[in-house]
Amino acid sequence: MINKKKLVTSLVTSSLLATFTLGSFADAHTYIINNEDINKNAQESSIGTLKQNNFKQSTIDSMKPRNLQSFQEDKVFKAPKEKTPITERARKSENALSNSKLNDVRSFTTVNMRTNENERTAAKLKYNGKNTNVWVADNYITDKQAKNIGEEFDNKIDPLVKEKFGEPSDVDHDGKVNILVYDIKDDFETTGSYTGGYFHPRDLYDVPHSNKAEVFYMDTYPSMGTDKNNLNEKKVYSTLAHEYQHMVNANQKLLKEQKEDGMDVWLDEAFAMASEHMYLQKPLDHRIEYYNNSTSIANGHSLIKWNHRGDVLSNYALSYLFSQYLSAQSDNGDKIFKEILQDPANTSEALENAIHKHVDPKMSLGEFMTNFRVALEKKEATGLHGFNGAPGLNSISPKPVRELPQTLAPQGSVMFETTSPIKVPKDKDEKVNYVKVK
């Protein structure tokens, strides 16, 4: 006999009444509902009532003071509407980054994440390497640390990302990328979340506020630690791999393919975190931890709507796990990332093309994403409902929803438990799929 409190919830215009618990229990019947719509701009599909709240902050508050990295964000910037190429005159300017030598000072346009305003940040060139320049605008970073960052990029990160994703652009014709190391102004002190780094596509064009070169921006505090007198530059190496993927992605989509916008953000971020995973050669535990604790994910957070409900950290967690599921299911492993990136089709079509080639020629993208949601719960060693035994992913632990919503956003999903089997309602929306997992 079950003694726990029960919740009776109406599903889809009273076509189904089921008894749900407020927590897990023995001999439960477990179901996953997924909205298989792959159009991120589509209307939500009907299934029940959701009282929305500040899921992101409630999740952060419940996790403090755990792994700080769980709250790291990567600011996403859209490509500029005007895409004026950088001119030879701009490249030859005495203030161009490409015309710099060691210990030169240049002024960069940076973004204040608190206000979203542009600012000027003066930085000194502290490493002039084969493939990268490291600029420092933080008195707590030593010359040795700047050199360590540059050498790690030149020797490990650069060849890895080029092999797995492709080549960066070279808009200033110097064959290098620039890494600006400074304390990004973010909301860490007030919310606990912070910006670990960013890449801005405007830098690839001759437009207002552009730095007219390949630049990505790396945070010192708190990304390298919360003791400013003892910062650890190694903590941002994986973020370097993350941001570099964004730069390579932008080169492919914006410059080579001449697209108005780049790859859909959710998949671009998935690839960036896959880049981190490959560099570290281990799972991103902080993303798994956030997934396991996320109130918004339990309540139907969308995989493909970026910053859904204002909880971008849940999107990072879902995108990361999707990248690992995709490579686990593909018959060519992580080579599938580069293949998708270099497919000129739109994001959904490129993904489905790769799934047809490397997973199942008859499976739709929506069906693949439903299998992904099931895999998060079942984690089977082989087959569609797991990660093929990939180490470290068995710690994934989705939470059952406490109250079923009436609607799910495109690629939103919930898991729920009942005391007895249910019948799938006949009047559910067409793209809503129910799967019994236990």
Curated annotation (Swiss-Prot):
Gene Ontology, cellular component aspect: extracellular region
InterPro entries, sorted: Peptidase_M30_hyicolysin (IPR019501)
UniProt EC number: 3.4.24.-
Active site feature: E243
A GO MF term: zinc ion binding
UniProt note: pH dependence: Optimum pH is 7.4-8.5.
Names of the cofactor(s): Zn(2+)
PTM description: Several different N-terminal ends may be produced, the favored N-terminus is position 102.
Alphabetized Pfam families for the sequence: Peptidase_M30
Keyword Cell inner membrane among UniProt keywords: no
Cofactor note: Binds 1 zinc ion per subunit.
Pro-peptide region(s): 27-101
Keyword list, A-Z: Hydrolase, Metal-binding, Metalloprotease, Protease, Secreted, Signal, Zinc, Zymogen
Ligand binding (Zn(2+)): H242, H246, E269
Regulation of its activity: Inhibited by metal- and zinc-specific inhibitors, such as EDTA and 1,10-phenanthroline in vitro. Is resistant to all inhibitors of serine, cysteine and aspartic proteases.
Class of this enzyme: hydrolase
Gene Ontology biological process terms, A to Z: proteolysis
Signal peptide: 1-26
Keyword Iron-sulfur tagged: no
Family: Belongs to the peptidase M30 family.
Function: Protease that has a low substrate specificity. Catalyzes the hydrolysis of glucagon, melittin and oxidized beta-insulin at various positions in vitro. Is not able to cleave elastin or the synthetic substrates FAGLA (a substrate for neutral proteinases) and FALGPA (a substrate for collagenase).
Protein's name according to its UniProt entry: Neutral metalloprotease ShpI
Organism of derivation: Staphylococcus hyicus
